[in-house]
Swiss-Prot record:
It comes from Persephonella marina (strain DSM 14350 / EX-H1). This is Acyl carrier protein. It is found in: Cytoplasm. Belongs to the acyl carrier protein (ACP) family. The modification O-(pantetheine 4'-phosphoryl)serine is found at S34. The keyword Lipid metabolism applies. 4'-phosphopantetheine is transferred from CoA to a specific serine of apo-ACP by AcpS. This modification is essential for activity because fatty acids are bound in thioester linkage to the sulfhydryl of the prosthetic group. The keyword Phosphoprotein applies. GO terms for molecular function: acyl binding; acyl carrier activity. Residues 1-74 form the Carrier domain. Coiled coil: none annotated. Carrier of the growing fatty acid chain in fatty acid biosynthesis. Gene3D superfamilies: ACP-like (1.10.1200.10). GO terms for biological process: lipid A biosynthetic process.
């Protein structure tokens, strides 16, 4: 799952998977803008069949946040 999340981020942002670390912040470290973040959230929802409400999406700042959130939602 973690690798798939990184692949989605790399595809959406046009960056190398090697640049993506759990502590990487989407905006500060990976160069995402607010639209990129919205598109990433939608891609995660589709890929992992989870719903991420806006109030939760606002709290997701790093790659690790996404990994933990989806694992929690999927009961892993």
């Amino acid at each position: 799952m973690e690798e798939r999340i990184k692949e989605i981020i790399a595809d959406q942002l046009g960056i190398d998977v090697e640049q993506i670390k759990p502590e990487s912040k989407f905006v500060d470290d990976l160069g995402a803008d607010s639209l990129d973040v919205v598109e990433l959230i939608m891609a995660f929802e589709e890929e992992f069949d989870v719903e991420i409400p806006d109030e939760d999406a606002e709290k997701i700042q790093t790659v690790g946040d996404v990994i933990n959130y989806i694992k929690e939602k999927k009961g892993e």
